[in-house]
Each structure stands twice: as C-alpha cells, then as structure tokens.
Amino acid sequence: MNIGDTAKLNTNPEDSPETILRLFVYGTLKRGYWNHQRFCAQARSIEPAVVWGRLYHLNAGFPAMEVPEGLILARGTADPLADARRQQEIGTPRFGRPTGDWDLIHGELVTFTDPQRDLPPIDRLEGFRPGGHSMYQRVMVAAGCRNASIAVWIYRMARVTNGERIDREWRG
C-alpha cells in the first residue's frame, strides 16, 4: 500500500478541527462486535484502515496489539481535548513499513466529534490510566486510510505475554 497523499478525512464544516478525534479499533469496538454499539454509536464515521503492528488473541478472549516503539507519535493523557489538539498538530505522518517482524493490521478508523464525551468511557474499558499502571496504553501512530496517511489513537499493549499471534485481522 502506498500511503503518501495528504487527505482530509470525514470533514464537516460544523466540526472544529480541535474536537475531531480519530481512533483506530481492531477488536471488540469494531462494527459487529459486543462493545461497538455501547462505545462507538456516537461516531461521526467509521471506515476501513490499517496500521503496522503485531496482533494477538488473548487467552481472555479479546485481542491486543503491539506497535513498534519507533512509530509512536504521542502518548495519551487524561485530557481528551488536548489529545484531539495534539492529533491535529501532528498532521500527516509518514506511513511506512517498519523494520522487523511487523504485520499490516486491518481494523476501523472511528471518528468522534466530542472527545470529552466519547473517549473517557473507552479509556476505562481499555484499562487506560495515564501516569498509572494500565492494561492498554493509548498511543498515537500513523494509519493508512483511503490512500492517505493519518494520525490515529490506538490502544496497545507494550508486551503481550498471554496470547496467540494472529495474522492481519481479529475476528473474535
């Protein structure tokens, strides 16, 4: 996949750029899975996207992903609006294959217009606590979507120790 074009995805004149937050989901938050309706019903849009990483099916029955440390653009905070602004500041990151044993992971790009309402419940679901011990960390990476590169937030595990590595896409 050649991702090099700059593109504005899902823009709406009523949305302030500072309030748009894009989240890449690869598991139970995807359409058709048990957490989607509860946590993503308020999304402005949802579309296919890809990121680089290693995907695992955990023994607990849900997925986790590792992402290359060198691809992390920012780390999540307890301030959803600051995180949305940071995403806008990053702009169009480079999306390229990292060195090492990484896969192109397929998931969905979920665009929210009210990060203060939408992000804290997902952070709680994922066990993300900025500055504390977290099950998942929310980090920003580059994603490929519609032949464009875009900065997205993603929940990742620093190291997966209790799951089976799977290829490309989690299907439950």
Regions found by a protein language model. Give the residues of each.
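Glycine-aromatic micro-motifs
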Residues: 2-172
